[in-house]
Amino acid sequence: MNNPLLSISNPVKFFKPPIPYRISLNTTINKKQKHQSKTLVVKSNKRSTTSLTSSVSLVRRRNNNGDGETTLVKKVGRDEKGQTVLLCALGYWVQGLRCFSWLALNFHMAHCLNLKPSTLQLVQYTASLPMVAKPLYGVLSDVLYIGGARRVPYISVGVLLQGLAWGSLAIFPGAREVLPSLMAFILLSNLGASITEVSQDALVAEYGLRYQINGLQSYALMASAVGGILGNLLGGYCLLKTPPRILFLAFTALLSLQLIVSLSSKEESVNLPRIGEVTPEISSVLGIVKKQFLDLKGIVQVDEISQPLIWIVSSIALVPLLSGSVFCYQTQVLNLDPSVIGMSKVIGQLMLLCLTVVYDRYWKKLPMRALIHIVQLLYAFSLLFDYILVKQINLAFGISNTAFVLCFSSVAEILAQFKILPFSVLLANMCPGGCEGSITSFLASTLCLSSVVSGFTGVGMANMIGITSKNYSNLPAGILIQSLAALVPLWFIHYVPMLEPGFEREGKRAMSKKSRRNRRVGRVIGQESFAYRRERET
């Protein structure tokens, strides 16, 4: 991209990762209830397994008088979990499959509408403008309920808008043959995709915080990568046999399946908290939205959040992309088949999937700044693969254009996508309760805005140096400028934190057994949180 606060009438407070950055939301909490809440005590006589399918979590809280305790038994059945997993996994999988329809759309604009490279790229990045408004969708998803829920209904609305857009492009010839109408339906499609992505990201972030599951964003990216692999593979092959409108229709059918799943899913199965009550000052919808924006503004201004955001946004916006020119060069000058372009994307998505798995298992324990430094260097040098292709240096080494495009064409794009993952995990772990949708959508919005700026800058640079559909002689110079611009963010790499907060806390908790006797010890297994306080031994 993409959380409600606990009910203030409920004296039970769930564990959530501590926010070490003094991020506070001006929520109205009953002081008496807050004063009575003291220590979370959970006892378990049996050794729990690490399975994520445990169905009961017992939480007890003892009051100050010590004469009573409040017990909450939280049941999450296997069927309910399966429904949640299906909803999220299918959503991210379809999100990755959007490349299936977009590959067909790019070939339709380049070959059927005969758009110039700069015009093609301008259409591509103008279509992303609805995604810039993701913070608005995130705030509405955080505070505005639809039918008693505030995540799943927004997913359904977004999927419906996408289905209407792609279905119209498939059925009505005038919708796809005239550029203004084509642009309108593309914008509608991306509006629906934005709403769906924000709701899914918020649902995943909130679910991970509530059940103490760290790094769920990695699995979301894996599902998206699997969808990208299948979408590019089928898209490249189908374009050789069928016109683009058939691919639009097939993707519409897939969206219909996702809509059925989302409509049949109940948000109560996720067992997420609700916003209990609001103060009279914010009782109106506009008041709630205004308060949420103020909370978001206060959170984003914290250095520990603003500095990583500034770096990742700058690292994208400072690079003038020439993706439209390179695409037209590959298809119009090198005459590469759609299957070759699609297969190159498949290989790239396989690389992204492997990188995500390795990151989730090993690399997320590495210093974040060092990891991002290496990835940015690799990204800057991988942009030179297009330079090698345009200058035909690969032929001097006996590598055909087809083989070179298959192996190296998508490396830079995949590294740019992978670079975002550590920042997504970082901000998801730092989200205060009730702002998951706002924070994740703000991240997605800034990333999208930086991509739009990068694309528009690339169009301007292409026009300045004279890159046209009939003259690609200056394309190598533009690619060199791209690569040099990608090195600029390394000058302020210190904005990236050394470690993610979760691993900093784990390092601080690594202490001797003697020290742990007098400290609170916590461990998380699966979805059950155990915490107890030992008295000082005398």
Curated annotation (Swiss-Prot):
Its main location: plastid. It is a multi-pass membrane protein. GO terms for cellular component: chloroplast membrane. InterPro entries: BT1 (IPR039309), FBT (IPR004324), MFS_trans_sf (IPR036259). It holds the Pfam family BT1. It comes from the Eukaryota. Residues 1-57 form a transit peptide. It is found in: Plastid, Chloroplast membrane. The chain crosses the membrane at residues 85-105, 129-149, 152-172, 178-198, 220-240, 246-266, 309-329, 339-359, 370-390, 395-415, 447-467, 479-499. Keywords: Chloroplast, Membrane, Plastid, Transit peptide, Transmembrane, Transmembrane helix, Transport. Could mediate folate transport. Belongs to the major facilitator superfamily. Folate-biopterin transporter (TC 2.A.71) family. This is Probable folate-biopterin transporter 9, chloroplastic.
